[in-house]
Amino acid sequence: MTRKTDDIFAAPLQEMIDFKFDERVVAVFPDMIQRSVPGYGMIISNIGILAAKYAQPGSHCYDLGCSLGAATLSMRQRISQRDCDIIAVDNSPAMIERGRELLARDSQPTVPVTLICADIQSVVIENASVVVLNFTLQFIPPEQRLALIKRIHAGLRPGGILILSEKIAFSEPARQHFHVEMHHDFKRANGYSDLEISQKRSALENVMIPETVACHKERLQEAGFSSSELWFQCFNFASMVAFK
């Protein structure tokens, strides 16, 4: 199937509204994410590899903020432990509907997947061995993030992991400037205009709030995780794994 091109912010907008994962975004999301997030494909692939190593027999694996199910599919194709299932959650009905269609095309559905349209903050997390927050926590209000991470930790089995991917910020202005500029250059190289970059940045300003890696690591420790490891970074995008 031909991938639809993201042109949502290509024309000047009369009024800037906050970014949301509606039908327009869902229609172009695969193109948008690949052209906007450096290393996205590598992150998705390695989520499957991490899940294959840390999934435990008879446990749940959660994909919280699953969007179209890329991380879910990566885990599903890699997990071989007995009696594992995946619970994929997103609060966008359009994402869940389209994700269901894409997952149905998987030719080797060896691991059961349950798709749930809900706020991830209201979902019960229990008997988990792997939990994924792939560019999801950044959309949760900062004052609510610790409570969510604590609930994830409480719902994980001993030896379980949380995979946390985020757009990150830097406390030093020079580093922040460098990484933001390089990210913009990455997007330009992938065909986005300066207008598109500027308008999308404005739309995301109030709904996506990045934090430093140090802030994430401190929160993970406060939530009870024994350790965490930064395993991927490209410009201002990173992925960590936290161990219970």
Curated annotation (Swiss-Prot):
GO terms for molecular function: carboxyl- or carbamoyltransferase activity; S-adenosyl-L-methionine binding. This is Carboxy-S-adenosyl-L-methionine synthase. It holds the Pfam family Methyltransf_25. InterPro entries: CmoA, Methyltransf_25, SAM-dependent_MTases_sf. Keywords: S-adenosyl-L-methionine, Transferase. One of its GO terms (biological process) is tRNA wobble uridine modification. The keyword Metal-binding does not apply. Belongs to the class I-like SAM-binding methyltransferase superfamily. Cx-SAM synthase family. Homodimer. It catalyses: prephenate + S-adenosyl-L-methionine = carboxy-S-adenosyl-L-methionine + 3-phenylpyruvate + H2O. S-adenosyl-L-methionine binds at Y40, G65, C66, S67, D90, N91, D119, I120, N134, R201. Catalyzes the conversion of S-adenosyl-L-methionine (SAM) to carboxy-S-adenosyl-L-methionine (Cx-SAM). Its EC number is 2.1.3.-.
